[in-house]
Structures are given as structure tokens and as C-alpha cells.
Amino acid sequence: MIYAGILAGGIGSRMGNVPLPKQFLDLDGKPILVHTVEKFLLTSEFDKIFIATPQKWISHTKDTLRKHHITDDRIEVVQGGSDRNETIMNIISAAEKENGISDDDVIITHDAVRPFLTRRIIKENIESVLKYGAVDTVITATDTIITSADGDSIQSIPVRSEMYQGQTPQSFNVNLLRNSYNDLSDEDKQIMTDACKILVVAGKQVKLVMGELYNIKITTPYDLKVANSIIKGGMLSD
């Protein structure tokens, strides 16, 4: 089975004084979440598309999908967790409850507030995760990256040609991710916010798929303005 897991657990705190979580904010006439879901619906390979959202927003999510005529039987809205990785585990649990989990099942996880992913990115994630078991979507870093442990002085300046910026989707063999997550201590689960890092720490190979510069995550008012400009400027591709 090939699962999609759309992570809509954010509350939009960096958006400022807004009445709704950021995934429900309007982008060119419809909620950001709807743009994202529509991209996944174009991919016939998905057997199931899970949308994970806070419990208090489940009804609103379902109403939003109905309002925008999204009625595909593959979609299921489930309750998210207290953090990103717990949310992914909740999706996996929902999938297991319905169908069980087999050794070759994979999940393509994606931020609900990255509405500009392309069919190419999805397709390459599916192909790569089926072959390698773990995939991250990235773009090359264009700015010099600086590390600083104390936030006051430079600790190191890595070679820029070896630096990448992480995006989503992040895609995994379900059992590989779940087993690696379950092997973590409770303390590590609290501090390890990136699913790919779980596998890297476990010594597993994570392959790279190239993303797109415009595959942005909309988390601030500035991001929302940029997103509207991307649409109006016709910068998108398939």
C-alpha cells in the first residue's frame, strides 16, 4: 500500500492574530489545505490519503473539504499528535487499523502548508521510497550556512556545496520508520522533531529527491504574500 500523510497539525502561532490555523487561511480563493490535498488527489498511486489535524479542528477540516467538493473515498481525516512524529505515528496506526501493515507499505508525508509541490516531486518520492526505504526532499543551499552553538559567535561554516535545505515530502517504508521511532528513548522523541533524522541517527540511508525553490512552507504573513505572488506570477510547473 502507498499512503499519503498530510500533516495539518499547526496552530499558526507565527501568523499573528488570525482566527484559524494557517492551513485554513485563504490562498487565491481557497484554503491552503485544499490546494495541497488537490495535488495528492492527482496521484492515482495513493491507496489512502490521511489528513492529520488537531482534534478540535477535525470537523472543520471535513467541512472545508466538503465545501470545496473534495469527496474522494481515499481521504480520511484523523487526529494528529502532540508533535510531528507522533502525528505520523497516529496516521500509521490508523492505516494499520484499517488494512494492517505489510513489509512493503510506504508513506509519503507532507506539510499541509506546502501547497506548491509538484507531480514530479510526488512521483520521485514514491519511486525512491519503494526502492530505498527513506527519502527526503531538498533543494541546494544558496546562502552560506553558519553554525553557532551559543547564538553569539560562529562555530563553523560548512562547505556550501554540501549543504541542502530540507522540504517535504519526506517518505518512508512504514515499518522502517516505526521501528526506528520505537527504538528512541522518550527523551530523544521529545527533541528529535525531524522524521528523517530518526533514520539518520539509526544509521539508515536516506536518499535525496530534489524539490523546487517555490515549494515553500507558509508559516508567516510574509510567506502568504510570497505564495500569492507565486500563483499570480505563473511560476508553477507540474
Swiss-Prot record:
The record marks 160, 217 as: Positions ribitol 5-phosphate for the nucleophilic attack. The keyword Nucleotidyltransferase applies. One of its GO terms (biological process) is cell wall organization. Keywords: Cell wall biogenesis/degradation, Nucleotidyltransferase, Teichoic acid biosynthesis, Transferase. Pathway: Cell wall biogenesis; poly(ribitol phosphate) teichoic acid biosynthesis. CTP binds at residues 7-10, 81-87. It catalyses: D-ribitol 5-phosphate + CTP + H(+) = CDP-L-ribitol + diphosphate. The record marks 14, 22 as: Transition state stabilizer. PROSITE patterns: ISPD (PS01295). Belongs to the IspD/TarI cytidylyltransferase family. TarI subfamily. Catalyzes the transfer of the cytidylyl group of CTP to D-ribitol 5-phosphate. This is Ribitol-5-phosphate cytidylyltransferase.
